[in-house]
């Protein structure tokens, strides 16, 4: 891109979708997926890192440009003793279809030194540029989906033709909360995480509050969801409660009620779908906590709890699914817009046989596609809780 034919467009909230809050930094803007108030109440580095990773966040604009450059400062996560992951992927969509991809090398590196405590150290690095060249000529709608597993500070947007703000979307907004699977763990690129694929199939705008390791019924997350505008809401509950061994059944049931009560304060009649965990054999009937298993040179997870303690209130996915079904049935008596979906209908025994979980917990790219297909059919399809109402 020559300097004689270059436009630099300020990156503002008008160009971003999927972000809950934007933090002004010395370089530019840092998208967040929790409000500033909620972030002040985060108790650990795991969620602080996860909510700042822009899963589902994208720049959206119209342009005739054939070359687009986005300067960013990524913060990448690596685990001590393991090879660093590949650089995060930026997906560029034209008129809703994936047209190009890029990555940014360098950046900050946060090294997790203890997988149990998530203790980490940060090494600072340089900013870089995601460059998309040889794009089709002519006016087009462009989306740049940011890497879902890299904190991404936005610095500058350059093009070889002017950029116009896209008109406000007329599509419904879907607000979703879940665990690392909803965050996009093990998906190959950001527009291929299951919530993004399901949103595309359902024709809705996604706000993704999938937080790796952190779907723990935190009240500050419920308050954030209460205050975020949405036409459709889903909450996926179970796997993090079990794999962190965060609570017992006595605490779990009122925590779910409280979480749903808080959401309903801001969205009293919005379709609200409670989704339980997908099939995860290591946690179906064995309590947590989950522990990393490094035997064989690759990361897998194993449950370390004692199944005999289920009678004392230790939680498993089977117990949580049963309890969630009861909670929703009870509440639906006076909340007709509350619905329940068993996560095994998204990914169950037959899906596991076809697309096993590589690390025993997280689906791969094919698994994400299967979950998205089933969610789109069951939630957005005819008769589903998110189906478009016809008059």
Predicted segment positions?
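N-terminal secretory targeting modules
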Residues: 1-173, 294, 380-391
């Amino acid at each position: 891109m020559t300097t004689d034919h270059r436009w630099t467009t300020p990156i503002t909230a008008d160009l971003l979708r999927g972000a809950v809050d934007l933090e002004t930094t010395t370089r530019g803007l840092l998208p967040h997926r929790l409000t500033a108030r909620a972030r002040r109440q985060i108790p650990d580095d795991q969620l602080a890192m996860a909510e700042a990773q822009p899963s589902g966040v994208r720049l959206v604009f119209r342009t005739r440009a054939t070359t687009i450059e986005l300067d960013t400062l990524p913060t990448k996560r690596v685990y001590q003793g393991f090879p660093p992951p590949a650089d995060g992927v930026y997906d560029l969509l034209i008129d809703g279809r994936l047209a190009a991809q890029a990555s940014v090398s360098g950046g900050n590196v946060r090294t997790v030194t203890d997988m149990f405590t998530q203790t980490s150290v940060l090494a600072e690095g340089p900013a870089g540029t995601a460059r998309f060249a040889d794009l089709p000529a002519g006016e087009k709608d462009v989306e740049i989906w940011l890497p879902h597993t890299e904190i991404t500070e936005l610095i500058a947007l350059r093009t070889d033709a002017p950029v116009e703000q896209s008109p406000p979307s007329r599509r419904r907004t879907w607000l979703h909360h879940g665990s690392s699977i909803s965050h996009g763990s093990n998906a190959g690129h950001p527009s291929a995480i299951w919530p993004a694929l399901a949103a595309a199939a359902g024709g809705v705008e996604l706000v993704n509050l999938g937080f790796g390791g952190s779907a723990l019924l935190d009240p500050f997350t419920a308050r954030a969801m209460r205050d975020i505008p949405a036409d459709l809401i889903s909450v996926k509950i179970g796997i993090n409660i079990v794999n962190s061994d965060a609570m017992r059944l006595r605490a779990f049931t009122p925590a779910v009620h409280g979480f749903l009560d808080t959401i309903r304060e801001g969205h009293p009649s919005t379709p609200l779908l409670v989704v339980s965990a997908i099939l995860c054999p290591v946690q179906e009937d064995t309590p947590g906590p989950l522990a990393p298993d490094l035997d064989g040179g690759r990361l897998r997870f194993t449950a370390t709890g004692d199944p005999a303690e289920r009678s004392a209130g230790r939680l498993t996915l089977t117990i949580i699914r049963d309890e969630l079904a009861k909670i929703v049935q009870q509440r639906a008596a006076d909340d007709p817009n509350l619905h329940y979906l068993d996560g095994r209908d998204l990914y169950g025994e037959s899906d596991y046989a076809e697309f096993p979980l590589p690390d025993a917990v997280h689906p791969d790219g094919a698994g994400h596609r299967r979950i998205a297909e089933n969610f789109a059919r069951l939630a957005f399809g005819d008769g589903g809780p998110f189906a478009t109402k016809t008059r």
